[in-house]
Amino acid sequence: MPIPLKQAVKIGAYVMWQKLKGQERYPLVLMLEPLFRCNLECIGCGKIQKPNEILNKNLTPDQCLDAANECDAPVVSIAGGEPLMHPQIIEIVEGLIKQKRYIYLCTNALLLKNFFGKLPISPYLTLSIHLDGLEDDHDRIVDKKGVFKIAVESVREAKKMGYRVTSATTFFEGTTVEQAETFLDFLNPLGLDGVTLSSAFRYPDAPDQDHFFGRKRTQEFFKELLGKNKKGRWDISHSPLYLEFLQGRRDYECTPWGNPNYSVLGWQKPCYLLDDGYAESFKELMDTTNWDSYGHKNNLKCADC
């Protein structure tokens, strides 16, 4: 299922306005990390490998809302860490809805049942629940047994209550195409409002460095997997152009300014994955980052992205 029509129209109008202004670089999705703390230690995550003094910090609701206004991206992805561990997450979500931004609240779902009826049911809010495979694979990736069952039950309950729900699915090296195929078939009856797919991006600080896809392997994997997606077999929330890109049938230049990252450390240079320093403001990020030095053709650190 593609994104809702109103969301597509708003984003399309935003992009058109930027082009009319002659704006070459502009944000589409604010990656907002109100905290780095988490209740899991996933094998592929480099975000929670921070010193305790950083893990104990939270962004305030005002800081989150000011950052959204400052960059003015139409979409906000609230990540972390586990956002539901933030003591004021509801206030943050409600504030972003008042700004009429489309929000993807990323969560491992361990705490989600405590927020049903508290998080607003709104066309501006999507619950993006991490599901990276069937039970054995998912629980291995998050390094804790029982998480898969909680996540699946949370999907079912959230849909019954009227929330918009998607899966955030990352495939790691070691997952076969057949396993991914079986997993995507499993998701169909859950009634998700779409499935988002990616390969595991390399975090230098992640505890497990052996299970990241390289660029070539990513393309081979998705070419075979998506070749099985006949007649809309799976409800994938991506444009055909992105799916062609995943398969290596199309190439794009890197546009890290399109997904600026704001956290307790500031505006991260250049993107969510690479940490080459921080700016104090969005304007400083845009003005002082050497954007041309990034991308898989220009920088070895970006080679497998």
Task: Label every PLM stretch briefly.
Residues Y26, D251, L265-C305:
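Flexible mid-to-C-terminal extensions adjoining Fe-S/redox cofactors in radical SAM and related proteins
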Residues W17-K21, F245-R250, W291-D292:
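Short, P/G- and charge-enriched loop/turn segments at secondary-structure junctions
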Residues P2-K118, S122-P123:
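Conserved alpha-helical substructure of the radical SAM core
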